């Protein structure tokens, strides 16, 4: 009985480590420009979750490509564009942002992802919010 229990625990641990929990997750962001009168709250999806990584002890003897770790990043995404209300005529009022359709564990691609871990920025509006959002798919 103990052997069966131990084997099932090891199997569960192995499957849990092999599975990725990197999925599209709902995210609310606030967008404002200093020249515009209003702030927009945008509901979108981002890639978030856990990816299996390993930290090697012999880092001095490995090439740099072997030291990079997988992150939760976009597999498929599309861009949406919104118009920020209350902008003067000389300011472009459009803001484009990615919407995650599916995610994967992989190397961070700087072409479409911010790969630098920064200090937490404030994610709130400092200006009045406008209640409507115009979206344009690109």
UniProtKB/Swiss-Prot annotation:
It holds the Pfam family Cys_knot. SUPFAM superfamilies: Cystine-knot cytokines. Residues 133-138 form a propeptide. InterPro entries: Cystine-knot_cytokine, Glyco_hormone_CN, Gonadotropin_bsu, Gonadotropin_bsu_CS. Disulfide bonds join 22-72, 36-87, 39-125, 47-103, 51-105, 108-115. Glycans are attached at residue 43. PROSITE patterns: GLYCO_HORMONE_BETA_1, GLYCO_HORMONE_BETA_2. Residues 1-20 form the signal peptide. The keyword Disulfide bond applies. One of its GO terms (cellular component) is cytoplasm. Heterodimer of a common alpha chain and a unique beta chain which confers biological specificity to thyrotropin, lutropin, follitropin and gonadotropin. This is Thyrotropin subunit beta. The gene is TSHB.
